[in-house]
């Protein structure tokens, strides 16, 4: 009787999970969902004929992942590999796996990425959120495994940061995520509202999202040209929240944003959505205080109400009212995680900013306001950077690290001033919006 009861309960649980997975796609237009999938394929990674495509997705997002698979084959992909994960299983791994297993990343998994990279694969990552899932899990164990994986996949991540590999990150909602964002709504209403917000923020809610993104990309070009021609020696950020930060820039730095172009000359959009224009600061020339204005989700844990103090580029002090241990673990990942690899300008006039809703997801929240990136700098943010060695990049002032984690600090009253070499100051942003 016990075994039979267990099987019945298991079947009920499985049925409930299936109903949940199916149910969340009944609350969004199927036509719009297909357009969203096509956007990831055609604009996100710009799949080429006979190209290998890897779709990385949690099993909960199987319906949308399959739509991407179909769109990729329609675009001419030679093969579409579904690389499934399961967050519930990942939690069990962190809770119960042996310590020596936590401290290493399997060779066979690293070998897969090398094989895919060598084959010229494009990677599409479908993400979602369940902020409470990893409660009770040791942040130290999670950090150990994440560090091990980044170390083994260092070459892969270097190729993604230099855009030698085309990749795209986009999101779909979950019931757990939706009720966190909209706690006052019913589960179904919350999910429907989050679908609407995600598609709106991703500019995927119109009749022709691909055309909308082509227009969106053109809007970046004039601002990038002005910033790149100006070659400001430093940027000065101030806000009423307490931020007073000087960010020194390396010589011959480049601002990029919107789309990027890989070494073959093929354009793509790594982030859907994207509203940022970003560059790499000089590793040793960041000074002052940065006060975060949005929670940071790192390794499944929440870091909130926190600040960072910089001296000569290095984080010398920090505090988080929530997630202090996680913040410490992040900063102590390696020597490079004490320094910055990215500085990004974002207007508060973007669709996501105007929605004025905290999504508890870095991909979306970083596109609502200015942010920094702790850790590794992209070679693409330096003239001829993709052709420089790691040593040459460091000599030019760029930071190297196993990670890159973005922290949002922009506000509605943020002021950004560009400082030229001779000391001339130029107002770049006022009240959180561009002035050029």
Segments predicted by a language model, with ranges:
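Dual-mode signal for accessory low-complexity, basic/Gly-rich regions
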Residues: 317-386
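Long, well-ordered mid-to-C-terminal structural blocks that present hydrophobic/aromatic surfaces
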Residues: 277-335
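Extended hydrophobic packing segments that form well-structured cores
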Residues: 391-436
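N-terminal amphipathic/basic-hydrophobic helices that include classical n-h-c signal peptides
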Residues: 1-24
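Active-site bordering "gate/hinge" segments
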Residues: 21-287, 434-436
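Short solvent-exposed loop/turn micro-motifs enriched in small/polar/acidic residues
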Residues: 38, 228-230, 283, 299-301, ...
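Short, glycine-/Ser/Thr-/acidic-enriched flexible segments
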Residues: 60-61, 129-131, 174, 242, ...
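Active-site lining segments that contact anionic ligands and/or coordinate catalytic metals
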Residues: 285-287, 303-305, 312-315, 338-342, ...
